């Protein structure tokens, strides 16, 4: 199974790339959406979050005020680490279920038994055979590097744009103040470091057509080497 780990900076255009991949028939798992599910009504994680912060993060109707929660965690690294410790295990489990279901489906369609890759060829957290019944899937994980999940992907794609575009897009997308935008950007690894560690870099500073061409080229070229690289040293999926 060819597993694309799609990441980048906040507001650089990961979702746009994900939509392009879906147009190519590639299943995409959205870690951000899974994180939102972790805080859904009735979730034990939501209850722990409400217990910690109380009415400060509740709307008058009793709903979770996600913007207020964001203001708290993006202003305090310790609080952000606590929240991530609640949510990340749930997201990891959801991603593993996504991969397992696709691998099982592929084995039924193609009649190829599921086999683990040799230890020297697999990255931790996945490890499904890349033989006849292999397929391409995408895990869109904004915090792929920060959460030490590099080893979940057979190749890592990083989406970039200019700093000015990044801030403009965030301002258009969310009702954030300039200070809140800077806090969100600062909470992640520098984009230059993500680019340095990427297998594929997609420049989203131009037109949609230009981005689509880059994605098409990456699909054609990078797909020749699934699981070719050993796990990156110094990281685990924990």
From Swiss-Prot:
Residue intervals passing through the bilayer? none
Which EC class heads this enzyme's classification?
Answer: transferase
InterPro entries, alphabetized: Depp_CoAkinase, P-loop_NTPase
Does the keyword section mention Transmembrane?
no
Question: Any coiled-coil ranges, and where?
Answer: none
| Molecular function GO labels | ATP binding; dephospho-CoA kinase activity
- Key word Kinase present in the record? yes
Q: Pfam families, per this entry?
A: CoaE (PF01121)
- The source's domain of life comes to Bacteria
Q: What pathway does the annotation place this protein in?
A: Cofactor biosynthesis; coenzyme A biosynthesis; CoA from (R)-pantothenate: step 5/5
What PROSITE patterns does the annotation carry?
A: DPCK (PS51219)
Q: Which GO terms describe its cellular component?
A: cytoplasm
Identify the residues that the record assigns to the DPCK domain, covering every copy: 3-233
- Keyword terms: ATP-binding, Coenzyme A biosynthesis, Cytoplasm, Kinase, Nucleotide-binding, Transferase
Q: What reaction gets catalysed by this protein?
A: 3'-dephospho-CoA + ATP = ADP + CoA + H(+)
Query: What is its subcellular localisation?
Result: Cytoplasm
Q: What is its EC number?
A: 2.7.1.24
Checking NCBIfam families in the record gives: dephospho-CoA kinase
The record's comment on protein family reads:
Belongs to the CoaE family.
| Chain's role | Catalyzes the phosphorylation of the 3'-hydroxyl group of dephosphocoenzyme A to form coenzyme A.
Which HAMAP family would you find in this protein's record?
Answer: Dephospho_CoA_kinase (MF_00376)
Q: Under what name is this protein listed? A: Dephospho-CoA kinase
Q: What is the lineage of its organism?
A: Bacteria, Bacillati, Cyanobacteriota, Cyanophyceae, Synechococcales
